[in-house]
Amino acid sequence: MTLSTNPRTKQIAASKGFDLGRNHGVLNSNVEYTRATKNPTSPYTSYSRTGLALNYQNTFAKVLRFNFGVTANIGGMNTEDDPDAQKGEWEKVRDNVLRANTSLKWLLNRSWITSLDFDASLNYTDNLARKRTYNLNSTSLPAVHAEQEGYYIAEMLPPVYYSTKYVDSKQLDYAANLKATWVRSWGDVHSNAKVGASWRANGNVGDGEYYVTPSLAPNGYRPRPYTDIPYMHNLAAYVEETLTVPLGSATLQLMAGLRAEKTFIKNTQYENTSSLSPRFNLKFRINDRLTVRGGWGITEKLPSFNVLYPLPEYRDTPVFATNYGSGQSAYVYHTQPYRILYNDNLKWQRNRNSEVGVDLRIGGTSISLVGYFNRTKYPYKLSAAFEPFSYNMMGVPSTLPDGTAYTMPANPAFRVDSQTGEIFVRDKDNPSAGWIAMQTTSTKRTFVKNTYQNNGSPVDRMGLEFVVEFPQINPIRTQLRLDGAYGYTKYVNEGEACYYPSTSTGGEFYPYVGVYLDNGGSSNVTYNGRKLHALDMNLTATTHVPSIRMIISLRLEATLVKRSQNLSEYRGREYAFNVDEDRNPTGGSIYDGDSYTAIWPVAYIDLDGNRHPFTDAEKNDPAFSSLLLRSGNAYSFNGDGYDPYFSANLSITKEIGDHVSVSFYANNFTNSRPFVASYATGVKAVFTPDFYYGLTVRLKF
C-alpha cells in the first residue's frame, strides 16, 4: 500500500499478487484513488480519479509466455461555485479510460528462428468537457456560423446570456506488433537478428465541440464532429542485426537496422506518405576500463495529421451593416471556407544524427563522454501565401428608383442571395411595399491569407554530454555523481515569408504584399536566424546510513551558460541594416547592437497576383514605404543571455521495520528563485522552479 501527499495531490494505492496455483499462472492487481486541487488556497476546482488494474501471466508447455492486462480509470474534474466567480458559471470534465493489452512469446528455439513475439493493445479515452459561461456585452453582437461559401445574414447574440459548451472526445486507438528473433553463434561470434512489423490506428469517435443552444454559439463557431475525421493508420516494418565479434581480449559489436513506415489516411492529397530510416551503431570494448562507441542514423518524419488531412477553416468578411428600430442591427457576411494548401514540392523532414562516445574507468571513477552532431534537413514550417480577393460592399440606398427618399423601416425583414450577395429589405409592417434592393457602395480589392506546409533551411545541433561517477567516500558512505550537457544550435532561414501591411489609403486596402527572407512573416522582426548555446550541470550526492536504514539524496542543478544571438544573413552578407527611429539608414554592422534595424522585401506581389523583383526604384517610391519593416526595439541583434542560476532538490527515504517506508522530497528546497537579467533587454526573469514538496508512505504486508 502506498500513501502519497503534497500540497495539491492526495493519493492512496494498494497492490496485491495472487498465485493461482500450479500451472494456473499469476494474477496481479492494483487499485488507486487520487484527488488533486488546482489551487490549495482556493479548492473550488478539483480532479479525482479511481483506477483499477489487473494483469494475468502464465507459461504454457514451457514455451508459450502469455500476458493479459486491463486498466480502467474513472475520474473527472469539477468546478464548484467559486464565490469570486460569476454566479452560475461552472466547469465539469468526465475523464474515463480503458486500456487492454496482451502479449505472447513463443520460444521456438529452432535452427531458423529462436522466438516469436506478438503484442496488441487497445486504448479508449472517454473525455467529456462541459463549461457554462456568463457572457456580457454592451450591445448585441453578430455571429456567423455558415459552412458553405456564399453570403449570409449573421445571427445576433443577446447582450447578456449564458452559454454551455460541450467538447466530446472519445479517442479510440489500436496497435499490434509482431517480431521474430533469430540468435546464432559461430564459436565466439554471436548474431542476434530481428525482423518485425507493427500496425497502429489512431482516431476519435466523439461528437467534438458543440453548444446546448446552437444559436448562442460564439461568432466563428462551426460544428466539427470528430467522427467526420478519418482514422490514421501506420504500418511499419523493420530489420535489425547485432553482431558481436571477439578481437583478442577486445570485443567489437556492430548493429545495423532499417525501418520503413507507411501512413494511410483516407482522402489525403499526399500519396507518398512513406519513410525510410537506416541506423548503424558500433561499440568497441577494448578492456574492462575502456569502451569506444559511435552511431549514425537518419530518421524521416512525416508532417502532422492536420497537414496530411487539413480541416476546414472559414473566412468571414463583413459586406453590409445597418441599424434600425431601437438600437437593433443587421449584418451580412461573405463566408469562404479554406484549408491548408497542398504543397506538391513538400519534402519529408529528415534528421541525420552522428555521435561518438567513450566510457572509461580510472581507479574507482567511471566517466562517460558523448559528442553528437545533428542536422535537420527540410524542417517543417507553416508559410503564408496571399492571393488577390475582391468583394462588393453594400449599403442602404438614399433614394428609391422613383427618386423618393428611402429610410430603413423600423421593423424590417432582410433577404440575401447567397450566390450574388444581393441584399433586399422589406417593411414587415407594410409588406405591400415589396422588397427594396440595397445598393453596391464600393468594390474592395485586397489579399486573403492562406497557409501551406513548407520546408525551412537546415538546423544544426551539436554538443557534448558527460557523466562522472566517483567512488564512494566510505567514512560517510556518500557517492557523488556529476553530469552535464553543452549544446549549440544554429539556423539561418533562407526561404521566403510574406507580409501584408494593414494600412489603407483613401478607404482602400494596401495594394502590395512584401516578400522577404524568412522572418516569420512578422511586421517587426528583422532577423532570419539564430544561434544558441547552453551549459547545464548537476551534482548529486547520495548517502546511505544503514544503521538507521535511511538514504539521503541531494541534487544541485545549475545552468552555467545560457546565450543566444539573432542573425540576419543572406548568401554570406548581412540582410538587415541599421536605421534610426524614423527609419533612416545609419550605417554600420547590425551586430554592433543598440540600434533599430530594418529590412526591405526581395520581391512584391500586386493586386493582379503578379510577382515583381523589389529594386532601388521601389525603395525610393513612397507608395512602397509601408513595405519597409523596422524592428520593434533597438536590441534585436544584441548578444543575449543570463547569469548562472541554481536550485537544489532533497530526497529522504527511511525504512521503519520490515513493512513501512517513508519518502520525503522537496524540490528547490532552499526556495532559490533569483531574478536574472537579460543581457540584451535588461528584463529580469525567474527560471528556477517553485518550491514544492511531498510525502509518500509505503506499507508492505
Report each predicted region and the residues it spans.
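Membrane-embedded beta-barrel scaffold of Gram-negative outer-membrane proteins
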Residues: 117-121, 131, 293, 325-448
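Outer-membrane beta-barrel transmembrane domain signature of Gram-negative proteins
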Residues: 2-4, 149-253, 500, 510-518, ...
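Flexible loop and strand-edge segments within Gram-negative outer membrane beta-barrel domains
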Residues: 34-113, 123-146, 165-171, 691-693
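Repeated loop/turn-to-beta-strand initiation elements of outer-membrane beta-barrel proteins
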Residues: 22-28, 62-68, 109-116, 128, ...
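Gram-negative outer-membrane beta-barrel transporters
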Residues: 247, 395-571
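Transmembrane beta-strands of outer-membrane beta-barrel pores
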Residues: 3-5, 20, 33-37, 72-76, ...
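Structural signature of Gram-negative outer-membrane beta-barrels, strongest in the C-terminal barrel
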Residues: 228-366, 370-375
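C-terminal beta-signal and adjacent terminal beta-strands/loops
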Residues: 376-378, 386, 559-634, 639-645, ...
